[in-house]
Amino acid sequence: MNPKHAYGAVAVWCVVFFALGSSMSAQEAVAPTHTGVPQDWSEHHILFSRDGLALHPDLIYREPRILHQAMQRWQKPNSDVFRGADPLPASAHDSGQGRDWNVLLGGRLAPDMFPAKYSFNPASPPSCSGDYVVFGLGTPGVTGGRANLVAFNNLYAGTGGLCGATETVLFAYNITTATGGEIVTSPILSEDGTKIAFVESLGTSAIFHVLTWTAGQGTLTDAAAPTMTSLTYSPSFNSTTSSPWVDYGTDTVYLGADNGEVYKITGVFKGTPTLAGSPWPVTVSTSFRLTPPVLDSNLGYLMVGSANGNLYRINIATGALSTLVVGKSGGTSPGIIAGPIVDVTNGTTFAVSANDGTSAVLVQADTASMTQLSKARLGEGSTGGTAIQLYEPAFTNGYFTNPADGDVRLCGTGAADTTPWQYSFGFIGRTMRTTVSFSQQLLTSTAARCTGWTEFFNPNINGGTDFFFFGLTQDCTATGAPGGCVEALTGTSTFTTTTVDGGPSGIVVDNYSTAGQASSIYLMGDKIDYAYKFTQNGLQ
């Protein structure tokens, strides 16, 4: 082993286990606050490397998303403290188990928006009662009628499942407080799992809610009225693309509105949600919609993309704004629509655009200087005049040891058409290579579109399997066929596919458990009002 890697491994292992031990000890102290594992849209928008983390060990305390992933990635298969039992056999992929559950909800998620999953205890086996997944629906609710914020527990149900035969509705609420109010961005969770924060989007305003749920309240067709705080943060503009980002260390949320402004809200989960004063809100891109923001807590910068094609950096202490041009605005596709991905240990930020005037691109920026480090080309994109939306990439497990050991994977298009392709790029040091290391046409259809990617390393499947989950919107079965699908990819070209009409929403992943049905993914269909759970291995 490289001595530098060995040092980094030992240093980070010490930090991870001390952090976990401190958390557990704190839970045994007087009147502790329970801390579980929230998994939402933001989990994979933070990158880090083990070698880099050894130089910034405080980040594992300040940014719980790092701790959650470190616990998953850097442990022995079948480790008891991390969901241990017996590793799954190599034949599990073809075991013939029945498909997991799906539920008709009466609403759906917007494209590239995510459910949120909560795991009650990271140091114990999965919990049938304590673990849940929640969906915020893009439809108005009715108290006593249709629900638009729905959660399920007994998640690990199905053939041979840990939690019996079927999932259970944990709660179902109508969160609509004004005519037409719905949830069109992704919800976020408190660390103890008792509260859910989200935006109610209206035609001309946006309301930030923090809801405290109670088990057993409401059903899918008999929604309960929730207990929640409400703050109208954008009184004159809607919010349709900018999901909230929570900084757990300061109990602060950052989020955007469709007028191109970014807002700061304090006291989110542990106090009273309050709009921060000057320099907030920060005007980023007047009249252009924003992506979800992502915080680099190491440098103190908030990164956000805009439909005008620019990547922006906000100094959270002063409100000072810096700009890097990534793509073009106008035409058939917005400039940037997926939230940036930020490496907090290597000081880099990644953003995707379907059109920079020449092609679709993945741009890597130096976060501190806001200069371009690298630009990878992803095919024609929307440069030919056809509407194309390109979403977030995902990074191989090797990247989290050292960027030079990993790759970035994502969808683009053909070089001279709009057929969906997958691309992979390696790294030299921390810098992305511009020459593709692997590319492959996914479908011959020019009408099918690709979703964003979610990566998950499961150490208990076949000795360690790096999964990539994404989807295609149509033509998965045959060109001209309407059916979309969700894909599980291992390696470069080993696919497992299952039908999801319209393709999947954003995808969240739960565990690396060996218990029955307890290593799964959660999503909704883009053209059908169903919530789905599939196993990671085999999409069953």
Short names for language-model regions:
Residues 1-12:
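Bacterial N-terminal signal peptides that target proteins for export
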Residues 10-21:
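Bacterial N-terminal signal peptides
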Residues 22-26:
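Sec/Tat signal peptide C-region and signal peptidase I cleavage site
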Residues 27-29, 34-35, 40-49, 63-67, ...:
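Mobile, glycine-rich extracellular loop/lid and propeptide segments
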Residues 55-57, 61-63:
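Polar/charged, compositionally biased leader and regulatory segments
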